[in-house]
Design a protein with these regions (language model features):
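Short acidic, glycine/serine/threonine-rich loops at helix termini
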Residues: 69, 101, 136-140, 163-166, ...
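A short, Trp-centered hydrophobic/proline-enriched beta-strand micro-motif
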Residues: 56, 119-129
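N-terminal glycine-rich flavin-associated loop
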Residues: 62, 86-108, 127, 134-137, ...
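A short core secondary-structure module
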Residues: 156-202
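A structural signal for short hydrophobic beta-strand segments in well-ordered beta-sheet cores
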Residues: 142-145
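Glycine-rich beta->alpha junctions and the first turn(s) of the following alpha-helix
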Residues: 202-209
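Buried hydrophobic positions in well-ordered alpha/beta secondary-structure cores of metabolic enzymes
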Residues: 75, 106, 153-155, 189
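Amphipathic, small/basic residue-rich leader segments at the start of a protein or domain
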Residues: 1-92, 112-116
Length: 209
């Protein structure tokens, strides 16, 4: 499947993906009822992801289609036509997790995470905003310290998408100095929610997108 997605002509792929979404949203499932709740049913989402739409934001080196802006936008457009909620889900994964990871992530992390996306339809989001500071990243209070071969992150994030659904998070934090102050620079960490040592507990969840 991955090899087919990687090499198939994109015009053929996106046409097939649009037809796939049309069939799922308008024929196979009752989207009118599904849309009344926040989350897509697991079976419904699994059917959507069979076409590997997030492959457009994964490098070819990792069996993706190569992180083409044109292809990413086409997938978002196809999703938007059937569901804004689906488009938002894809947009968060593509623009806020996959593209930054592809551009800045360590190769070993890329290899492991992208494989999970391609083989298991994993999802990822970004944790940057905080309830008291919004988008004022320079005032964020989430901090980290380097302990041996690992990092310890402490803080609370306020996020409005993919809460409870993401398998991975791109978390922003500022380094603690020896005096306990926070530096101005912001660093990014990839956490895996299925790993007990990296799991980020959810304090509150809202019934929205």
């Amino acid at each position: 499947m991955n090899q087919v997605i990687e090499n198939v002509d994109f015009d053929s792929y996106i046409s097939s993906f649009r037809k796939h979404l049309y069939h799922l949203f308008r024929e196979e499932f009752d989207y009118g009822s599904i849309s009344l709740k926040r989350d897509f049913p697991a079976e419904f989402l699994a059917e959507i992801m069979k076409k590997k739409p997030l492959a457009v934001a994964i490098p070819k080196l990792h069996a993706g289609r190569g992180v083409s802006v044109k292809e990413c936008l086409a997938v978002l457009s196809a999703a938007s036509y059937e569901s804004l909620a689906l488009s938002l889900m894809f947009g968060i994964n593509i623009a806020l997790f996959l593209e930054p990871l592809a551009k800045y992530g360590n190769f070993s992390v890329q290899e492991r995470v992208f494989k999970d996306f391609m083989e298991n339809n994993a999802m990822g989001g970004l944790m940057i905003t905080e309830k008291a500071y919004g988008s004022d990243a320079l005032n964020m209070k989430t901090g980290y310290e380097h302990i041996g071969n690992s990092y310890k992150i402490k803080g609370e994030k306020h996020w409005q998408g993919l809460s409870g659904a993401a398998n991975y998070w791109l978390v922003t934090a500022r380094k603690y100095t020896t005096t306990g102050e926070l530096t101005r620079d912001i660093d990014f960490f990839v956490t895996e929610n299925g790993n007990p040592e990296q799991h980020i507990p959810m304090v509150e969840r809202y019934n929205n997108l």
